[in-house]
A protein has these predicted regions:
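Gly/Pro-rich hinge or "lid" segments in bacterial periplasmic/extracellular proteins
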Residues: 78, 173-228, 234
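N-terminal lobe/hinge region of extracytoplasmic solute-binding protein
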Residues: 38-97, 128, 197
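Ligand/substrate-recognition segments at binding pockets and active sites
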Residues: 213, 362-432
């Protein structure tokens, strides 16, 4: 097979994918067999999380990737670059100079998949419901600037905000703002199980075994009315226990596409293969990984302990040994490719330095070695997570300042325990809800945040976050965003580690893979089609 490298044109913020590809048609067609997509995302309905696919609760990339295919939002993020554009709406925009009143007009003739008409009242119901339920996942925080939702007739929706929020159009493109049918979703109760009723480009039928979704079939919604053009009639998503099983399925032809999460070894092998029936797409991503601290926990309550960890951890070594060229060290919660990024942690701590860390602990009268347990999820972020934490353990213990053990748990157990504050130190990842610096800061630092963290900085919450949101020009918001990042680097409630790239592997007759995932890790199944094999 002759491979070629295709670089899509970079346009004002476009994160262009690089394609190591075979020849074939560039355009997919409707019809034909279902395109089968593999993922290692696990979807479980449990006592702690009974409603994994309710838009008012779901707040992880896997669940959102299902909702984005099935539940329509007023706005949508374009596949390449730029600001959100109307989707279920015909038009949207701020109607005042202060960015506090936002109005949308729904498309005429909009319907749910079952044929029920969609009105402005349904939009209001959906937003009000998410805010009323206040799910412990923290997803409702994306709508925290909404004061009231007003309707005028069947097609006009007006959002009155409690403070200026230039990022609000982005927030209306996220699943928590998705339009749901009041017939199927109670106002104050989450919808248990895996059923979804929306107006998105697909309907979804779930195959469930032992309270776990193992297979989801997405079928083209004949009532869909929006901006998306579907290149297929049906896509099947299969959940695999691990990357190895998913890779074997692709090799055997049981699946057509492999998405997150592949192992670093798989990515290296497929990228370097000179004769393969598998195509690999590499694209820049906005995913980050970090350590988070329960700042109320005795072991890390003293800021000096957290600062010492920040001073010892060697990001370059960590990335090199685990991910190689698939990731880059990160010295801020905001990725280097996002407007507003500042190398705050490098500016404060510089290169790893055990002597400096020792001095920090000594000045705070901290007895060493400090005993810590680092917790991680064994199945949510891919097979390399364990090795990553083994290296963190090795680095910290080698300093002589820490006595670190590591402990892994499945996401089903890990996430509820983290939300309850059961872990002193734990590792998490973040796929942005939208590509703006605000979404790397507010979800962790604002009130009702996604980590349920006890850390509070009043200047960040009451001054800097609101200040940054007033600026429609995000470059102008830079000073506020930089100040937030500097405070985080000093207090270390969170320690950023690295930012990663994204990869999609596919059979050679599958088209559209270069746009199957956008920069925020949104799966865009409608882009996939079938071309011609070489």
């Amino acid at each position: 097979m002759n491979r070629k490298t295709l670089v899509l044109p970079a346009v004002a913020g476009l994160l262009a994918p690089v394609l190591a590809a075979c020849g074939g048609s560039d355009s997919g067609g409707n019809g034909g067999d279902a395109i089968v997509v593999g993922t290692t995302d696990r979807f479980t309905a449990s006592k702690e999380d009974p409603a994994p696919l309710d838009p008012a609760f779901a707040y992880d990339v896997g669940s959102w990737n299902i909702l984005r295919q099935t539940v329509q939002t007023l706005m949508i993020q374009p596949k390449g670059e730029g600001d959100p554009v109307p989707e279920a709406a015909e038009r949207c925009g701020f109607t005042d100079s202060g960015n506090e009143r936002y109005a949308c007009t729904l498309r005429d003739g909009l319907k749910f998949a079952n044929g029920d008409p969609i009105t402005a009242a349904d939009v209001k119901y959906s937003i009000d419901r998410a805010l009323a339920i206040k799910a412990d996942s923290g997803v409702f925080g994306l709508l925290s600037t909404v004061d009231t939702v007003e309707t005028q007739g069947d097609r006009e929706v007006i959002f009155h905000l409690n403070t200026a929020d230039a990022t609000f159009p982005f927030k209306l493109s996220t699943p928590v703002a998705g339009i749901i049918n009041p017939k199927n979703y109670e106002k104050t109760t989450l919808r248990a199980g895996f059923a979804i009723d929306g107006s998105g480009p697909y309907t979804m039928k779930a195959k469930v075994e032992n309270d776990e979704l193992v297979d989801a079939v997405f079928t083209k919604n004949p009532n869909y009315k929006g901006t998306l053009e579907l290149n297929n009639d049906k896509v099947e998503m299969r959940s695999f226990e691990d990357a190895g099983a998913m890779g074997d399925a692709l090799d055997k032809g049981d699946i057509d596409v492999m998405t997150r999460t592949m192992s670093p070894e798989q990515i290296r092998t497929l990228t370097n293969a000179s004769d393969s029936k598998i195509d690999m797409v590499e694209m820049p991503g906005l995913e980050i990984r970090y350590l988070a601290f329960n700042t109320d926990a005795p072991s890390v309550k003293d800021k000096a302990v957290r600062q010492a960890v920040a001073q010892v951890v060697n990001r370059s070594e960590l990335v090199s040994e685990v991910y190689g060229s698939q990731a880059e060290p990160l010295y801020s919660l905001v990725p280097a490719t996002v407007t507003g990024h500042s190398n705050a942690f490098f500016n404060k701590y510089g290169d790893p330095d055990v002597a400096k860390a020792k001095s920090m602990l000594a000045k705070a009268d901290i007895t060493t070695p400090v005993k810590l347990t680092l917790h991680y999820t064994t199945d949510h972020y891919g097979p390399a997570t364990k090795k990553e934490f083994e290296i963190l353990q090795k680095q910290l213990n080698a300093s002589g300042l820490f006595d670190v053990t590591i402990e892994g748990a499945t996401w089903e157990k890990f996430r509820p325990a983290e939300l309850k504050g059961s872990y002193d130190v734990y590792g998490m990842g973040w796929f942005p809800d939208f590509p703006d610096a605000d979404n790397y800061l507010a979800p962790f630092l604002d009130k009702d945040n996604t980590l349920n963290t006890p850390y509070v900085n009043s200047r960040i919450r009451n001054t800097l976050i609101p200040e940054s949101r007033r600026e429609a020009d995000r470059l102008t918001a830079g000073s506020s965003l930089t100040a937030i990042q500097d405070i985080v680097a000093d207090d270390v409630p969170i320690l950023p580690l690295w930012q990663g790239k994204q990869y999609v592997a596919s059979a050679e007759d599958v088209t559209g893979t270069a746009y199957a995932i956008n920069s925020t890790a949104t799966l865009q199944l409608w882009e996939l089609g079938r071309g011609v094999k070489n």
